[in-house]
Amino acid sequence: MKPFTVLDAIVAPLDRANVDTDAIIPKQFLKSIKRSGFGPNLFDEWRYLDVGQPGQDCSNRPKNPDFVLNQARYQGAQVLLARDNFGCGSSREHAPWALEDYGFRVIIAPSFADIFFNNSFKNGLLPIKLDAAELDVLFQQCEATEGYRLKVDLAAQTITRPDGKAIAFDVDPFRKECLLNGWDDIGLTLRHADKIRDFEAKRRAEHPYYFA
């Protein structure tokens, strides 16, 4: 997993509440268990005017010109502003996979669905809960300013606006450490590889019949 330290990036505003996981990545794309390749189908039913299918070349599909991610000013965005209850609906790890594969590293919203919130940290996304009034200001500034950027400093736990105002946010210390170091569940386990090998060797010596 790629470490997250400081991100200074373009922001895209998704001004919708209760964005569920089926909107983030529709059900027909869940057959694959690869973590990559979902970016072109992120928000598929909103981004395109047709119905997408797995394996389809999205480059020639008709796009919805009104959808935020299809607007030129938001190309390359790595920070997504959202509204309440982002990531609700059915549990699917494909949702953070699709957001990360598209290029997003940070999602800022007043609240998140619990399972999506937890899955995001495990897949290199930083979900930030921000007060709705503070978030309203970010939406207003973003929509009024082309090329609007935010600086997110995980170590300092701050979001810095273009006008220089720093906004503090909370993050669980363990999740923060994992993101800063790029540790997913496998990475955390491999940190103890020597102890695991020692335990296995000891167990094999003490109970050889288990391994016969």
From Swiss-Prot:
Q: What range does the record give for the signal peptide?
A: none
Entry EC number(s): 4.2.1.33
Cite the annotated pathway.
Amino-acid biosynthesis; L-leucine biosynthesis; L-leucine from 3-methyl-2-oxobutanoate: step 2/4
UniProt cross-references to Pfam families, sorted A to Z: Aconitase_C
> What GO molecular function annotation could you give as one example from this UniProt entry?
3-isopropylmalate dehydratase activity
Q: Name one GO cellular component term.
A: 3-isopropylmalate dehydratase complex
Q: Which SUPFAM superfamilies does this one have? A: LeuD/IlvD-like
Q: Which UniProt keywords apply?
A: Amino-acid biosynthesis, Branched-chain amino acid biosynthesis, Leucine biosynthesis, Lyase
| Keyword Cytoplasm belongs to the record | no
Organism superkingdom: Bacteria
* Enzyme class (EC, first level): lyase
Q: Which GO terms describe its biological process?
A: L-leucine biosynthetic process
User: Which reactions is this enzyme annotated as catalysing?
Assistant: (2R,3S)-3-isopropylmalate = (2S)-2-isopropylmalate
Tell me the PANTHER family matching this sequence. Answer: 3-ISOPROPYLMALATE DEHYDRATASE SMALL SUBUNIT (PTHR43345:SF5), 3-ISOPROPYLMALATE DEHYDRATASE SMALL SUBUNIT 2-RELATED-RELATED (PTHR43345)
Task: Identify the HAMAP family for this entry.
Answer: LeuD_type1 (MF_01031)
Could you say which protein family the record assigns here?
Belongs to the LeuD family. LeuD type 1 subfamily.
The record describes the protein's role as: Catalyzes the isomerization between 2-isopropylmalate and 3-isopropylmalate, via the formation of 2-isopropylmaleate.
What is annotated about its quaternary structure and interactions? Heterodimer of LeuC and LeuD.
> What's the protein called, per UniProt?
3-isopropylmalate dehydratase small subunit
Organism of origin is Azoarcus sp. (strain BH72)
Top-level taxonomy: Bacteria, Pseudomonadati, Pseudomonadota, Betaproteobacteria, Rhodocyclales
Gene behind this chain? leuD
